């Protein structure tokens, strides 16, 4: 697996001076380090992980979003979801795999999966700010943590979501 942290640090958990500086500057967080090391620990079992670029992890409420490069989400989602279950067991969180640098529609589809998106559009507010409205198919599901999803979208993509439901 590739990441902002070097292979030595990912494997040993001991930070070299370069990686420690990244941590101190906030370019890498403790959470990033923790998740990256979990992924590295199962690389031999799931070799597709060797090609995955891990960009970081973002936590909101009980949801942990794992950010990977465009095209890498499927590698983690293969193996019948075993990698997801491993991460859920280890962290106690609900896991989402998101591509941080993909197009906005794909990002939102992955964020709200398995719900399907009917419409995405922009709303310009009188104060000049823009919201991205996402209309999901179905009635509001209590299992969907809308606030956590909004926070993840804000932190990863800088977009303000307005989430609605329609049949
Ligand atoms: Zn290092």
Label every model-predicted segment.
Residues 1-167:
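RNA-contacting regions in translation and RNA-metabolism proteins
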